[in-house]
From Swiss-Prot:
Keywords: Cytoplasm, Magnesium, Metal-binding, Nucleotidyltransferase, RNA-binding, Transferase. It catalyses: RNA(n+1) + phosphate = RNA(n) + a ribonucleoside 5'-diphosphate. This is Polyribonucleotide nucleotidyltransferase. Belongs to the polyribonucleotide nucleotidyltransferase family. Its main location: cytoplasm. Pfam families: KH_1, PNPase, RNase_PH, RNase_PH_C, S1. It is an enzyme of class 2 (transferase). Its cofactor is Mg(2+). The gene is pnp. It is found in: Cytoplasm. GO terms for biological process: mRNA catabolic process; RNA processing. Residues 672-731 form the S1 motif domain. It comes from Campylobacter concisus (strain 13826). Mg(2+) binds at residues 515, 521.
Length: 732
C-alpha cells in the first residue's frame, strides 16, 4: 500500500506492509532518489529496571551511493559520527512519545538504502522512524515530524536541499508533534563576503612582502533572539502541517495497541506524609548536598534510615518504594521553592550564574589551554595547532570524495568527574553529542582562511550540570591562548524551565539537580551579538513562543555576564610562543612547484629532513605552507625554497611561464665578473646575493668572514656557474 504526501517542500512516498512485515512496525519512505527503511521491534518481557529500554540505530549502506566500503573489511562496521549523531536525534525526538511505565526492550532501526545527494537524510530518517512507530502496536498515539529550516536571502526556507543549505545563514532542525515541540538543534553557518582582503590581514604570521594571496572575509552570522523565535515558529507551523497529514493518512492503518502491561507509578501517600513530618529537614539538607554534586547518595542514606524505622517495618514499607516516594518528595520541594520563593537549591536567584574562575595556559607544553570552572563544573580545555596533513578525513555518503575537517572538538567525560569509579571507555553518544554541540558553537568564530588545522579537547574534571557549555567557554579561551585570532569570544550557558500550574520559572546556569527535576534542558551559546548554537529538549507539553522568547533573552543576559569575565581573562593571556608551531605561508609561480618537489619527491624530502619542518603544497594556487617547531628552521626552509624557485633553469614541465617572463632577456655571467649586491636572504649554508635582473648567487658560509644581514651591501665575484646556479666569492 502506497501513500504520497506532498508537504514542506518535498514529496514523501510511503510504502506500507511491503517489507519487513515481521517487525512491529515498518515503512519504506522515498523522497526523490533517497530510499529509507525504518523498522520497530519490541520484546514481550519487561525489564525490571525503572527506565525506558529504547535503542535507536541509524545505518548508512555504502551501496546506497554506489560505493564499496573502504579499508580492509569491505562491509559496514562501526557507525561513523554522523550516523551516531543522527541516531541520537531520532532517539531524542521519539523517546518522549512512549507512555509512562513502558519497560519493554524496543529497537528502532533506520537504514539508508538509496541516497540522493540533495536530500536531507536526517529529516527523512526521523519521519520514516516516526511513521513506523506510529503504525506499530506500541501505544504511541501521535506521529512526530522533523523539519530543517534555512535562512537564505533574508527568507526562511523549509527543508532546503543540501546545496541550498550551503547558502544559508543558519541550520535549524526542529522535531515535534502537531501539539508540541520536542527537540531543537541550531547552528549559525559562517559565510564569505565578496570583498577581497589581503591574507596578511587574516593571519598576521604571514610575511606581507611575499604573500600576495588574497582571501575572503568571513561573517559569523550570529542569529538574534527575536529572529530565532521567528525561525522556531516557522518550523512549528511546518511540523503542524506534516504531523496532521501523517495522522490523517495513517490512522486507519495503525495496528491495534498490544495488550502491554505498563508499570504503575509507585505511590504511597502514607510514606509521603511520614517523610514530610519526620524527615523534611534531612531532605532539605540532602538537597543542599545534591546541589554540590550530581550524585544522589544522600537520598539513599535517608531511604535506608526510614526503612529501618519501627513504623516502616510495622507497615511493611519496601525500601524501593520508600526510595521512589522520597525522590518525588525531593523533586516537589525543589520545584516549590523555585516557583514560590524564587530561590534555588544552592541559594541562588533565578538568573544568578555560579561563581566562575578562569586560568589560561596552565599546561606549559600545550599550545593553548584553559581551566574553566563554574560552580562544581570544571573543564580543562586544550587547543592544539597542526598543518593540513593533520586534518581529519571522513566519508559522507552523499559525497563522492572524502571531506577534510580542519577544526575538531573532542569532549571527554570520565567517571571521576561525578565521583564514580567507572571504567574509561571509548566516547559514547553523549560524548559525541556534547562535543558536536561545542564544535558548532565555536566553529563560526574560527576563520575558514586560517592556515592551521585545530583540535580542541575538553576534559571534564568535575561535573554538576552544564559541562558542554563550560567546554564552549573554555574552548574559546583555549583558542585565544594558542594564538588563534578568533573573530569573537563565544560563551555558553545551560537554561532550565519549571512549570507548576499557571506559574513558570526560567533558570540560568542550571546544575545537575535542576536538570533532572526540571521540564526543559536548553543550551544556548553565542557571542555578544547573537546565537551561534542552540540545543533544546522539552520534557513537558508544548512551550509558548512568549516563554521561549523569555528564556532566550534571559540566556543572553547570562551569556553577557560570562563574556565579560572571559574578556578580562582574554586580556591577561600570555601566549607561550616557545611551544607554538611556526608557520609561513607564501606563493610561488605554480609552474615551479615541481622544482620544490624534485624528482620522485627527492628535493622536498631533503628540505623536510634538513630543516625539520613539514611542507604542504597547493599546485593550483602555487601556495607553499611551511610549519615547524623553530622559527629559524622555518625561515631557512622558506629562503631555500625561494632560492630554488627563483632559478631560471627550474623545471616547469610544459607549464606556461608568467607573462612578465616571456620577453625577459636572460643575463649571462663570466667567471670573475664582479658585482656589488644586496644580501637578499640568510640561510644555514650561506647567503643569497642579488646580482642583476633579479638573479641571485650563493655566497657559501665557508667563504664568509664576518656575519651578514639582509640588506647588507657586499662586493662579490662569480666563481662558478652551472647552468643558472651561480656560486660567489668575496672580493677583498
Amino acid at each position: 500500500m502506497q501513500y504520497s504526501i506532498e508537504v514542506n517542500n518535498q514529496v514523501e512516498i510511503f510504502d506500507l506492509n511491503k517489507v519487513a512485515k515481521q517487525a512491529s512496525g515498518a515503512v519504506l519512505l522515498r523522497v526523490k532518489n533517497t530510499v529509507v527503511l525504518a523498522t520497530v521491534a519490541r520484546e514481550d518481557v519487561q525489564v525490571e529496571e525503572d527506565f525506558l529500554p529504547l535503542t535507536v540505530q541509524y545505518i548508512e549502506k555504502a551501496y546506497a551511493a554506489g560505493k564499496i566500503p573502504g579499508g580492509y573489511v569491505k562491509r559496514e562496521t562501526k557507525p561513523g559520527d554522523f550516523e551516531t549523531l543522527t541516531a541520537r536525534i531520532i532517539d531524542r525526538s521519539l523517546r518522549p512519545l512512549f507512555p509512562k511505565g513502558y519497560a519493554y526492550p524496543t529497537q528502532i532501526v533506520v537504514m539508508v538504502l538509496s541516497a540522493d545527494p540533495e536530500v536531507d537524510l536526517q529529516v527523512v530518517s526521523l519521519n520514516a522512524a516516526s511513521v513506523a512507530l506510529y503504525l506499530s502496536d506500541i501505544p504511541v498515539n501521535r506521529p512526530v515530524c522533523g523539519v530543517r529550516v534555512g535562512y537564505i536571502d533574508d527568507k526562511f526556507v523549509i527543508n532546503p536541499s543540501n546545496s541550498e543549505l550551503k547558502q544559508s545563514a543558519i541550520d535549524l532542525y526542529v522535531a515535534g508533534t502537531k501539539d508540541e515541540l520536542l527537540m531543537i538543534e541550531m547552528r549559525s553557518l559562517p559565510q564569505q563576503t565578496t570583498q577581497l582582503i589581503p591574507m596578511v590581514a587574516i593571519e598576521p604570521m604571514i610575511d606581507p612582502s611575499l604573500s600576495d594571496s588574497m582571501a575572503q572575509k568571513q561573517v559569523m552570522n550570529e542569529f538574534s533572539e527575536d529572529k530565532m523565535v521567528e525561525a522556531i515558529d516557522f518550523a512549528g507551523k511546518a511540523i503542524l502541517r506534516a504531523s496532521s497529514a501523517y495522522e490523517e493518512a495513517f490512522k486507519e492503518h495503525k495496528k491495534e495497541d498490544a495488550a502491554l502491561e505498563l508499570k504503575p507509578e509507585i505511590e504511597n501517600e502514607n510514606i509521603a506524609i511520614y517523610i514530610d513530618k519526620f524527615y523534611k529537614a534531612e531532605v532539605k539538607n540532602a538537597i543542599n548536598q545534591m546541589a554540590k554534586s550530581e550524585r544522589a547518595s544522600e537520598l539513599g542514606k535517608i531511604a535506608k534510615q526510614i526503612s529501618s524505622d519501627e513504623v516502616a517495618q510495622k507497615e511493611g514499607w519496601d525500601e524501593a518504594v520508600i526510595t521512589n516516594v522520597l525522590g518525588k518528595y525531593k523533586k516537589k520541594i525543589v520545584r516549590e521553592q523555585i516557583i514560590n520563593e524564587g530561590i534555588r537549591a544552592d541559594g541562588r536567584g533565578l538568573e544568578e550564574v555560579r561563581p566562575i574562575s578562569i586560568e589560561t595556559n596552565v599546561l606549559p607544553n600545550a599550545h593553548g589551554s584553559c581551566l574553566f570552572t563554574r560552580g562544581q563544573t570544571q573543564a580543562l580545555v586544550v587547543a592544539t595547532l597542526g598543518t593540513d596533513s593533520d586534518a581529519q578525513m571522513y566519508d559522507i555518503l552523499t559525497e563522492k570524495a572524502p571531506l577534510v575537517e580542519k577544526f575538531m572538538f573532542n569532549y571527554n567525560f570520565p567517571g571521576f568527574s561525578v565521583g564514580e569509579a567507572s571504567p574509561l571507555k571509548a566516547p559514547g553518544r553523549r560524548e559525541l553529542g556534547h562535543g558536536n554541540l561545542a564544535k558548532r558553537a565555536l566553529a563560526p568564530s574560527i576563520d575558514l582562511a586560517s592556515p592551521y588545522t585545530i583540535r580542541v579537547v575538553s576534559e571534564i574534571l568535575e561535573s554538576n550540570g552544564s559541562s558542554s557549555m563550560a567546554s564552549v567557554c573554555g574552548g574559546s579561551l583555549a583558542l585565544r591562548a594558542a594564538g588563534v585570532n578568533t573573530q569573537k569570544l563565544v560563551a555558553g550557558v545551560a537554561m532550565g524551565l519549571i512549570f507548576e500550574g499557571e506559574k513558570h520559572a526560567v533558570l540560568t546556569d542550571i546544575m545537575g539537580l535542576e536538570d533532572h527535576d526540571g521540564d526543559m534542558d536548553f543550551k544556548v551559546a553565542g557571542t555578544s551579538d547573537g546565537i551561534t548554537a542552540l540545543q533544546m529538549d522539552i520534557k513537558l507539553g508544548g512551550i509558548s513562543l512568549e516563554v521561549l522568547k523569555e528564556a532566550l533573552y534571559q540566556a543572553k543576559r547570562g551569556r553577557e555576564h560570562i563574556l565579560a569575565l572571559m574578556t578580562q581573562a582574554d586580556k591577561n593571556i600570555e601566549i607561550n610562543e616557545d611551544v607554538l608551531p611556526k608557520l609561513e605561508l607564501f606563493n610561488v609561480d605554480p609552474s615551479k612547484i615541481v622544482d620544490i618537489i624534485g624528482q620522485a619527491g627527492k628535493t622536498i624530502k631533503e628540505i623536510i629532513e634538513k630543516f625539520e619542518v613539514s611542507i604542504d603544497l597547493d599546485r593550483e594556487k602555487g601556495e607553499v605552507k611551511i610549519a615547524g617547531g623553530a622559527k629559524k628552521n622555518v625561515d631557512a626552509a622558506k629562503d631555500y625554497i625561494i632560492s630554488i624557485t627563483s632559478k631560471e633553469n627550474s623545471r616547469s614541465f610544459g607549464k606556461k611561464p608568467f607573462k612578465h617572463d616571456k620577453d625577459r632577456v636572460k643575463p649571462t655571467f663570466n667567471i670573475g665578473d664582479e658585482f656589488t649586491g644586496s644580501v637578499k636572504s640568510v640561510v644555514d649554508f650561506g647567503v643569497f646575493i642579488e646580482l642583476k635582473d633579479g638573479v641571485d648567487g650563493l655566497l657559501h658560509i665557508s667563504k664568509i668572514k664576518s656575519p651578514l644581514n639582509v640588506g647588507d651591501q657586499v662586493k662579490v665575484c662569480v666563481s662558478e656557474q652551472k647552468g643558472n646556479k651561480i656560486s660567489l666569492s668575496l672580493v677583498e
